[in-house]
């Protein structure tokens, strides 16, 4: 586990200790403590950044921003001890990760620049500016365009602090020369990409001789960090401050003007004349200290530890270490969660398609077998569904319930409606029979009519259920074969062909059933039992009536009551028969047989080996996505391994 409490806050940097009067042994012991506590933290984050983890998660960092000509490059030069590209216009054209590593006094200077998968050793500090310029040209091309591609500069020296900074292009407001018209927008978008992250400390460089409230860099930092919790202000060019305004500068540094929770520092770096006269960076540091010691207004800031490059280096190292220690537990958890999410997402894309023909066959078998198993589970009502979805059988059963209601509604007409219909048939079709004799033709005609009107609703239900099943099977195909467009297309074609075939068979069977229902038939014992129940029910209702005068006046012919009882008894039986048998037909043809035929048809694809390559051809975006996810997963796996080994 990574722990946030590493005891860093109470540890002085070796930079500050070397300015004291301790003997060499004390210096050595302090440096060892510093190496033990500080270096592992920074090295860990640098190693994660070198892995590319920043493509997946934000890492603790210090981003350096400033308006053009704010002195940003001079500050970085003073901290790193190397010259960086200079000139007019846009000089920093790519984000520059400046990794500073403090070495022991006996060690020699080392440098290395990395970009676009290239790594170039730099033998001498004087070559840094040239290598950075060439790297920017390689990435962003000739001219003044910018790029989001990182350049990493690693400087190892006894004279630099342990620190990692990200230098961003200076903010420009107006495109000049051959700069893109939207150069201001491009630069600000690049800067926001970094300073928006809560894991980033924003180091805002502002000239001391300008109104701090008008600087674009500080305004951008305030937009993303309104409380100033992770912003440090750096004032430069104190030697250019107008006489009489020094106290205002002191007030700014003391956080009395534009409040930042982390406050301000002030430094004096090499000016243009100093560079022209080739003043060394060491000499510039000496001159800087003398400037603050001798300045009537600024010497107090030096005593308060708020002035000079060495104080800034110590402060930034301390801030970065505390920031790293604070964010490491969260970072570890984020990496773990992201690793799990990417692993799950990668599983959806399956394995890479094998090259060997025999392996391709097994790959296709596996995919078809998985598809077939889900189809069978689906038709048996055992498939897995998401929380708010329903199983196929549940959807089909709902349609069957609607069908049952349609049948029931068709037969359940009120007394008056049925009696009226019976009376009409009596008046139209009664033959030689005396009153009180039941006309079987009347009974049969009414039954046939009521059954016949259910045929088309039954066929409509068949089409509805078939569409539901076809759509479900297509969804299963998409789930398993969507990344293989030929295999998915073939499966959909088979799903449609078998649907038409089975739907036609089911419709024939349904229409045949309704033709058979035109033969009025019921088992004698079943019919007698149903008729007896109807008569008993009517007798009970008659018994419960207080007066049957109204009823008798409505039923003038005994045959009407008799036919009504027979109709009701037969309706009950035919209703049960139709309600159950039509769903059985549909289940048999367009659910079970449909699924089984589809399974067999998919297995037949394995017989044509010449089609394997065609069937297993992936979408280009699928292949690229799998590769992208595998790269991310590898990065995160290595990041977790490094975090696990961190001695926190």
Curated annotation (Swiss-Prot):
Bilayer-crossing regions:
none
Q: Which InterPro entries match?
A: Dynamin, Dynamin_GTPase, Dynamin_GTPase_CS, Dynamin_N, Dynamin_stalk, G_DYNAMIN_dom, GED, GED_dom
**Location of the region described as G2 motif in the Swiss-Prot/TrEMBL record:** 91-93
> What are the binding positions for GTP in this chain?
66-73, 167-171, 236-239
Q: Where is this region: G5 motif?
A: 268-271
Membrane topology recorded in Swiss-Prot or TrEMBL: Peripheral membrane protein
Q: Which GO terms describe its molecular function?
A: GTP binding; GTPase activity; microtubule binding
Q: Which domain of life is it from?
A: Eukaryota
GED domain spans which residues? 560-648
The disulfide bridges present are none
Enumerate the residue ranges of region (Disordered): 1-26
How are the domains described in the entry?
The C-terminal GTPase effector domain (GED) is involved in oligomerization and viral target recognition.
The job of this chain, per UniProt, is described as:
Interferon-induced dynamin-like GTPase with antiviral activity against rabies virus (RABV), vesicular stomatitis virus (VSV) and murine pneumonia virus (MPV). Isoform 1 but not isoform 2 shows antiviral activity against vesicular stomatitis virus (VSV).
Quaternary arrangement and interactors, per the entry? Homooligomer. Oligomerizes into multimeric filamentous or ring-like structures by virtue of its stalk domain. Oligomerization is critical for GTPase activity, protein stability, and recognition of viral target structures. Interacts with TRPC1, TRPC3, TRPC4, TRPC5, TRPC6 and TRPC7. Interacts with HSPA5. Interacts with TUBB/TUBB5. Interacts with DDX39A and DDX39B.
State the similarity comment. Belongs to the TRAFAC class dynamin-like GTPase superfamily. Dynamin/Fzo/YdjA family.
Name of this protein: Interferon-induced GTP-binding protein Mx1
Q: Which organism is it from?
A: Bos taurus (Bovine)
* Protein's gene: MX1
């Amino acid at each position: 586990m990574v722990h946030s409490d590493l005891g860093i806050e109470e540890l002085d940097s070796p930079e500050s200790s070397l300015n004291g009067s301790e003997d060499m042994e004390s210096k050595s012991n302090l440096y060892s403590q510093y190496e033990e506590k500080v270096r592992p933290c920074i090295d860990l984050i640098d190693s994660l950044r070198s892995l590319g983890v920043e493509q997946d998660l934000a890492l603790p960092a210090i981003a350096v921003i400033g308006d053009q000509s704010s002195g940003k490059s001079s500050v970085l030069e003073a901290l790193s001890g190397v010259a960086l590209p200079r000139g007019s216009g846009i000089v920093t054209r790519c984000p520059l990760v400046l990794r500073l590593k403090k070495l022991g006094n006996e060690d020699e200077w080392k440098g290395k620049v990395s970009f676009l998968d290239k790594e170039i050793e730099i033998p001498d500090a004087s070559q840094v500016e040239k290598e950075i310029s060439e790297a920017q040209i390689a990435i962003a091309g000739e001219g003044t365009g910018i790029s989001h591609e990182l350049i990493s500069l690693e400087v190892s020296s006894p004279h630099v602090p342990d620190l990692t900074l990200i230098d961003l292009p200076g903010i420009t407001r107006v495109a000049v020369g051959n700069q893109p018209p939207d150069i201001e927008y491009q630069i600000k978008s690049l800067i926001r990409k970094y300073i928006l992250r809560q894991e980033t400390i924003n180091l805002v460089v502002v000239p001391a001789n300008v109104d701090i409230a008008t600087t674009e860099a500080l305004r951008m930092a305030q937009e993303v960090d309104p409380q100033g919790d992770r912003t440090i202000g750096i004032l430069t060019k104190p030697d250019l401050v107008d006489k009489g305004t020094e106290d205002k500068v002191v007030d700014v540094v003391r956080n009395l003007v534009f409040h930042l929770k982390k406050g301000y520092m002030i430094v004096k770096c090499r000016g243009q004349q100093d560079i022209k006269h080739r003043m060394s960076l060491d000499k510039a540091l000496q001159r800087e200290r003398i400037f603050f010691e001798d300045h009537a207004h600024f010497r107090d800031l030096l005593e308060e530890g708020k002035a000079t490059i060495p104080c800034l280096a110590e402060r930034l190292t301390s801030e970065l270490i505390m920031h790293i220690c604070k964010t490491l537990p969260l970072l570890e958890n984020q990496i773990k969660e992201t690793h799990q999410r990417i692993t799950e997402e990668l599983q959806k894309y399956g394995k890479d398609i094998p090259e060997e023909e025999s392996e391709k066959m097994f790959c296709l078998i596996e995919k078809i077998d998985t598809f077939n198993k889900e189809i069978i589970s689906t038709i048996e009502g055992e498939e897995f569904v998401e929380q708010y979805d329903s199983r196929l059988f549940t959807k089909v059963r709902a349609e069957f319930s609607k069908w049952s209601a349609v049948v029931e509604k068709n037969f359940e007409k009120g007394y008056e409606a049925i009696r009226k219909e019976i009376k009409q048939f009596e008046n139209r079709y009664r033959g030689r029979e005396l009153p009180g004799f039941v006309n079987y033709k009347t009974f049969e005609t009414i039954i046939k009519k009521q059954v016949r009107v259910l045929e088309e609703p039954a066929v409509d239900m068949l089409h509805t259920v078939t569409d539901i099943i076809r759509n479900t099977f297509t969804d299963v195909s998409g789930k398993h074969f969507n990344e293989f467009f030929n295999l998915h297309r073939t499966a959909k074609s088979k799903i449609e062909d078998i649907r038409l075939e089975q739907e036609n068979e089911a419709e024939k069977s349904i229409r045949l059933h309704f033709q058979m229902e035109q033969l009025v038939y019921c088992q004698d014992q079943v019919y007698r039992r149903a008729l007896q129940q109807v008569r008993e029910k009517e007798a009970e209702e008659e018994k419960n009536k207080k007066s049957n005068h109204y009823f008798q006046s409505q039923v003038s012919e005994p045959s009407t009551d008799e036919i009504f009882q027979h109709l009701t008894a037969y309706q009950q039986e035919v209703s049960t028969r139709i309600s159950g048998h039509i769903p059985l037909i549909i289940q048999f043809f367009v659910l079970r047989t449909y699924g089984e035929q589809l399974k067999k048809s998919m297995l037949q694809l394995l017989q044509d080996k010449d089609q394997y390559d065609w069937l297993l051809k992936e979408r280009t975006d699928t292949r690229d996505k799998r590769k992208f996810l595998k790269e991310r997963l590898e990065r995160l796996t290595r990041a977790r391994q490094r975090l696990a080994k961190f001695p926190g």
